[in-house]
């Protein structure tokens, strides 16, 4: 990607600023999402604001970073965004409920089952910004995090935050 982007005329600084690439210890420009399936983060207005990448094959075993997200930038702040919000906002308002899951593939799986009022905060750290965004559409949030210890802890913490916000 870095090589193709440079051939198209993109400058190194732009590729670094947008988070598509990073520099390794030798100063080489490296593709941030190499070997990963890419999921675009589409903001509430319908514009791509960032990307997430996930290793899906056998290389997942032992990989330190199974998931890689865009770094914070002028247009992307992970704690301000919700994966799938643009596609889900009408269904959330119509159903007066939103399901909050952990990851991109959870959102996609639920959509495949016909459940469209679902978003992900891409991990377990629910933020006040994300709660306020959802509150524009509904006061009814159901947390559907994974059943591991991190998911259970996040669901308890998230429930406390939601109750503090009157939801």
State where each predicted segment sits:
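Phosphate-handling DNA/RNA-contact segment within nucleic-acid enzymes
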Residues: 1-141, 154-155
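Arginine/glycine-rich "motif VI" loop of SF2 helicases in the C-terminal RecA-like domain
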Residues: 133, 160-167
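Phosphate/diphosphate-binding loops
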Residues: 147-163
């Amino acid at each position: 990607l870095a090589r193709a982007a440079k051939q198209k005329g993109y400058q190194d600084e732009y590729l670094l600023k947008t988070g598509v690439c990073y520099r390794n210890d030798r100063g080489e420009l490296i593709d941030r999402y190499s070997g990963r399936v890419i999921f675009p983060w589409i903001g509430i207005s319908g514009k791509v604001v960032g990307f997430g990448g996930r290793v899906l094959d056998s290389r997942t075993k032992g990989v330190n970073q199974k998931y890689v997200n865009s770094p914070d930038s002028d247009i992307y702040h992970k704690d301000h965004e919700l994966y799938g919000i643009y596609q889900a906002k009408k269904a959330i308002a119509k159903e007066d409920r939103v399901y909050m899951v952990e990851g991109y593939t959870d959102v996609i799986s639920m959509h495949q089952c016909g459940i469209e009022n679902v978003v992900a905060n891409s991990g377990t750290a629910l933020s006040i910004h994300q709660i306020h965004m959802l509150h524009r559409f509904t006061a009814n949030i159901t947390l559907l995090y994974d059943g591991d210890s991190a998911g259970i802890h996040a669901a308890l913490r998230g429930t406390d935050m939601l109750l503090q916000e009157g939801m």
